[in-house]
Every structure is written in structure tokens, then in C-alpha cells.
Amino acid sequence: MKTWYMVVVIGFLATLAQTSLALKEEDCEVCVKTVRRFADSLDESTKKDYKQIETAFKKFCKTQKNKEHRFCYYLGGLEESATGILNELSKPLSWSMPAEKVCEKLKKKDAQVCDLRYEKQIDLNSVDLKKLKVRDLKKILNDWDESCDGCLEKGDFIKRIEELKPKYSRSEL
């Protein structure tokens, strides 16, 4: 009887440890969001065949930019990709495995997949520009494809952002 009790307790603890170790979306955000978005774009007939999923993923990757493009590179979804672990994505998706689990499998093959992070967006309506670093101010201008010729000090960058703010900020009503 004691042995049976110990087996049940150990089984419970193993299950508890497994759920706490499961990959969360914020641990691998680019992978989870990209896989989820890609899986949602597939039609039912494509979802059943892993070869069609691979072809669709390569087509999907041609339209991706920034972090998603890098994710595609790591998986082998681009022509210039050095390695290919595309079957680690396509086969689990054909089994209707959730994005978190797919990314968990991908992370075991290539940890770089989960090193990708989205950059935090700065809300210009609520942030105090004077408290930002010059690097962040330059990033705001760069994201807008604007430059600040002759800007040397933080105040110059702030002045330029304030000039361009009405053009680029989306104020919600």
C-alpha cells in the first residue's frame, strides 16, 4: 500500500514539474507568435500534409521582415538559410500541436529560436522624452525613417521628435 502511495505522489510531482517547465509565450515570443500566425493562415487541406506546410512556410517567409525574417532563417525557410529544421515545425503542425509545444521542440533543436525578442514600443503620448536615453531618441527617429542632421545634444533630438510627432503619432479618440 505504501509503495502504491509513493508511486502516486511521484507521478503527481513529475506532472507538476512538467507543467511548470512548459514553455510560456513570453519565453519565446517571436517563435510562438510567428508559428501561431502561420498556422492560422493555413487552410484545412494544407494542415494535414507536412510537405505542403513546408512549402507554405517558405512562401510565408518571403514576406516576413525583422525578427520573423530571422526566425525563418533559423528554421531553414529562406533560400540563404545555412541549416534546416523545417520538419520540426511542419510535422508537429500537421498533428495540430499548439504553437507553444512546437516552439518547445524547436528550442531543443536550436536555442537561438527563443533568443529572438520583440523590441518594446515606446508610447509617445505618455512617455517623458527627457527621461529617455539618446539611443532611444535616435531609435524613434530611425523607426520613422527620419534623421536629425546637426543634432548633438539630447535637447536637439527631443526638439526634432516634437516637431515630427504630429506627423507620426497616432492619437486615439
From Swiss-Prot:
> Which one GO biological process term can you cite for this protein?
dopaminergic neuron differentiation
Keywords in alphabetical order, please.
Developmental protein, Disulfide bond, Secreted, Signal
Say if the entry is tagged with keyword RNA-binding: no
Q: Which cysteine pairs make disulfide bonds?
A: 28-114, 31-103, 61-72, 148-151
Q: Where is the signal peptide?
A: 1-22
Q: Where found in the cell?
A: Secreted
Superkingdom of source = Eukaryota
Q: Does the keyword Nucleotide-binding apply?
A: no
Give GO cellular component annotations, separated by semicolons. endoplasmic reticulum; extracellular space; synapse
The record's annotation in PANTHER family points to:
ARMET-LIKE PROTEIN (PTHR12990), MESENCEPHALIC ASTROCYTE-DERIVED NEUROTROPHIC FACTOR HOMOLOG (PTHR12990:SF5)
The job of this chain, per UniProt, is described as: Required during the maturation of the embryonic nervous system for maintenance of neuronal and cuticular connectivity. Essential for maintenance of dopaminergic neurons and dopamine levels.
The family this protein is said to belong to: Belongs to the ARMET family.
* Name this protein carries in UniProt: Mesencephalic astrocyte-derived neurotrophic factor homolog
Identify the species of origin.
Answer: Drosophila erecta (Fruit fly)
